[in-house]
Regions:
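C-terminal accessory helical subdomains adjacent to catalytic cores in phosphodiester-
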Residues: 2-11, 18, 25-36, 43-159
Length: 159
């Protein structure tokens, strides 16, 4: 992606969040060519404070490493493009709401429909947490449900 002088590179690294951070901090990884690195993970029922601390330790004078945590899962961000999030008890609740909003079957629940309303990013940023809560700060793990995805999109100039 290249947007008004901002370029983005997406790299998929398989494994749990701490494995991802370890790989990015390893000898074969050079983050110095980037001003910012954003690592997007799901909460998945596990505390991610250790992951966020390791992201901060990866930062240098040249590169800031941010951790984005979606609680309980990334479907919180997707759901917010369609409607306000609900008070999900867990990942299964958020995923059921996603299927309800998109009409996807259980078999296709990890797919993105062709008609995702990506143009509703501003609305999604306001709806990705409960009305009684505020958007969690950058590099934090918010309450359930919430996500810090809006901070990444603001950094990219998309919000």
């Amino acid at each position: 992606m290249n947007h008004d002088g901002i370029s983005a590179k997406v790299k998929v690294i398989k494994g749990d969040p701490l494995t991802v951070v370890k790989q990015l901090g390893g000898p074969r990884s050079d983050l110095s060519e980037y001003e910012e690195v954003w690592i997007v993970v799901d909460h998945d029922g596990r505390d991610r404070h250790d992951f966020l601390a390791k992201c901060r330790r990866l930062s240098s004078k040249r590169t800031v490493v941010h951790g984005v945590v979606s609680v309980p899962c990334f479907e919180v961000w997707l759901n917010a493009h369609y409607a306000p999030v609900k008070n999900y008890r867990n990942q299964a609740d958020a995923q059921a709401h996603y299927r309800e909003l998109t009409g996807l079957s259980s078999k296709d629940a990890k797919m993105l429909p062709d008609d995702v309303p990506w143009d509703r990013g501003v609305q999604a940023a306001a709806r990705c947490h409960l009305p009684t809560d505020s958007l969690p700060e950058t590099d934090t793990q918010g309450p359930c449900p919430s996500t810090t995805m809006p901070h990444l999109l603001r950094s990219l100039g998309l919000l």
